[in-house]
Amino acid sequence: MEKEFGLISWARNTNVYEVNTRQYTPEGTFQAFFAHLPRLAEMGIEVLWFMPITPISMVNRKGSLGSYYACSSYTSINPEFGSVKDFKSIIDKAHALGMKVIIDWVANHTGCDHEWTKSHPAFYKRNHEGSFYDAHGWDDVIDLNYENHEMRQAMIACMKYWIVECGIDGFRCDMAMLTPVDFWHQARQQLELEKQLFWLAELDPLENPSYMRVFDAAYTWKWMHATKQFKDEGARHIHIL
């Protein structure tokens, strides 16, 4: 399938290191993580992928801490991690050490008390009773309505915020196949007027090939499971993909 966007040069043969800020240090803060940057650079890490850094919704929260993937604002920092200034310091230092930074982006849904639920309720899907809902049974999030073009532009504006204000280098897009592929095309086309970015999709390209016209990389789970089966059981059990 022909790609619609070029791959940024530094992303060829790169590696990606996932950062869970809450769990990475005893403090669970950006400032505490900052001290680890030289060590990570020395290890040969090239791209830091931060799991969601946005604040977590209170309504229907999972446990006492909540899920990173149920955000209450797309343009704020989770206060338990620190401030935008703290995160910008990480990006500046990472860049100085030759590393890039991408952030997790959750476009399909928000937390149940996201600021848009009050300011822009039309941004959300509703069930037959007229209530916000999630189609996949996740009870701490509600689905966004991608038929609403104003919502699409608001989402792109929020993504742009992190590029302009903090200088991030790309996005890891959570459950990317749940969001229409034409939105990702629209977002990439507009956002790369600012700078060329790296786009990583959480999806299997063997099952969602059309998305790879837009994304640079993805998770080939089907191939991974097939190769593991080959290792564990032998070639006679492998079916052609």
Regions from the PLM with identified roles:
Residues 47, 170, 198:
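Short, Asp-centered acidic motifs that coordinate Mg2+ and/or phosphate
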Residues 2-15, 22-31, 38-46, 52-166, ...:
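Substrate-binding/active-site clefts of carbohydrate-active enzymes
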Residues 48-49, 215:
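Carboxylate/His-rich catalytic cores and anion/metal-binding grooves
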